From Swiss-Prot:
Biological source species: Arthroderma benhamiae (strain ATCC MYA-4681 / CBS 112371)
Residues bearing a lipid moiety (GPI-anchor amidated alanine): 233
Primary residence: membrane
Name of the protein this chain belongs to: Extracellular serine-rich protein ARB_03024
Region (Disordered): 135-235
Length: 256
């Protein structure tokens, strides 16, 4: 019994070790899957790396180029590498050795040759014939839900740069505006509602003064330039001046 378990474990480990990861570049060099003809067995994974442009990975039928298989779909959804950034992947696990026809359903990409075959038959159905018949398909089709694989890589941020300006339409006077890439710099924030904060020059940080510490006005239309000293404070100042004079006189006499 123990020997049987050991044999089964060894077989299982051998199967795991034999599994391969096959990398395919999507959009590299144009409307292409690179490579576009691969072999994969049960247990392998095909990782599609979106390199450039707007593309998707769709499982289709040989007899209906550029059209998806209903009920047995593989679809990555359309990936925009311009917005999401490079590094987005779609990993498809392979469960059998059947032939699979993959294409890009975006616009006329399939019609222009953007397709791939996994486990192409040694005779009969072939990729060259698939691409020829795809040229006359009026419009490509795709599923409506991501299925058959897992999206990963760096596309989770959605492509938004953390340094991009707010789209609220108004700039805040309490935050430093970003340095503009062109045009004239401005040392004053714009007072126009809806102004773009990206057009203002970065200003030095200001120290905020509590409103209670600002001296009150001494008369209509004017503010006191200096606060009024209290009698006690004035007496203290005079005493300090007399003491300083005595110290200075003593020092002078000592020099004599």
């Amino acid at each position: 019994m123990v020997a049987t378990k050991s044999v089964l474990s060894a077989v299982a480990l051998a199967g795991v070790a034999a599994a391969e990861t096959i990398d395919v570049m999507v959009g590299q060099g144009g409307l292409k899957f690179v490579p576009d003809n691969i072999k994969a067995k049960a247990g392998d994974e095909v990782v599609f790396h979106f390199v450039m442009g707007h593309h998707d990975v769709t499982l289709g039928r040989y007899d209906s180029p550029c059209m998806p298989i209903q009920g047995e779909s593989i679809w990555s959804g359309v990936v925009d590498t311009v917005e999401k950034g490079k590094g987005v992947t779609f990993t498809v696990p392979i469960h059998d050795d059947k032939t699979k026809w993959i294409y890009c359903s975006v616009a006329k990409h399939c019609q222009n040759g953007m397709s791939l075959v996994i486990n192409e038959p040694s005779s009969g159905d072939n990729q060259a014939d698939y691409k020829d018949r795809a040229k006359i398909v009026p419009q490509s089709g795709s599923p409506t839900q991501v299925k058959g694989g897992t999206l990963g890589g760096s596309g989770g941020s959605g492509g938004s740069s953390s340094s991009s300006a707010s789209s609220s339409g108004s700039s805040s006077g309490t935050t430093s505006a970003p340095t503009p890439t062109g045009g004239h710099s401005s040392s004053h924030p714009s007072s126009t509602s809806g102004s773009d904060s990206s057009n203002t020059q970065s200003t030095p940080d200001a120290t905020l003064i509590p409103s209670g510490s600002i001296p009150s006005a001494t008369g209509s239309g004017s503010h006191s330039s200096t606060p009024t000293a209290s009698p006690g404070a004035a007496a203290g100042l005079k005493g300090s001046a007399v003491l300083a004079g005595v110290v200075a006189l003593g020092a002078w006499i000592g020099l004599l």
